[in-house]
Amino acid sequence: GVRTILVDGKGFHLNGKLIKFQGVCLHHDLGPLGAAVNRAALIRQIRILKDMGCDAIRTAHNMPSTMQMEVCDSMGMMVMAESFDMWLYPKCKNGYALHFRDWAERDMTNLVLCHRNHPCIVMWSIGNEIPEQWSVQGRQLSRWLQDICHRLDPTRPVTQGMDKAEASLQSGFAQVM
């Protein structure tokens, strides 16, 4: 049905109701199945999460599968779809930082275009504990990625996982969100 999303000083509202997420960060693997996508395993995973009181997941640092979003749609699980674990500053030697300049806009665009019609998606995340969160460059990149999301989907908020609160506030990085 029709839904509305609002974020204000009180928090996150879905269809006019204030929501306090009971969520988890969920990596894309299915335990011993690895990264293979299996509908029955996804249904089992979401059912277990719901049985323990979970109503939301944050996809951890990768574009989620369409099948996972379909299962979340059908089971009423809210999703924050997250794109990146790093931007320009590497967290490891062979990570996404090597490809960020060439691929970030396409990857962010693909995430939003692929999943924006899924009712389970309640917000977009442009990064997880990004090292640039303490810098002016990070603030600029954050604004750029947020603008991509809002251009393609003006109906949902954009956020990111920050682990250095004081530095994020001092650099203006946190205020972009």
Descriptions of predicted regions:
Residues G1-R143, V158-T159:
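Active-site-adjacent substrate/metal-binding segments within catalytic domains
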Residues Q140-M177:
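Extracellular glycoside hydrolase catalytic/binding regions
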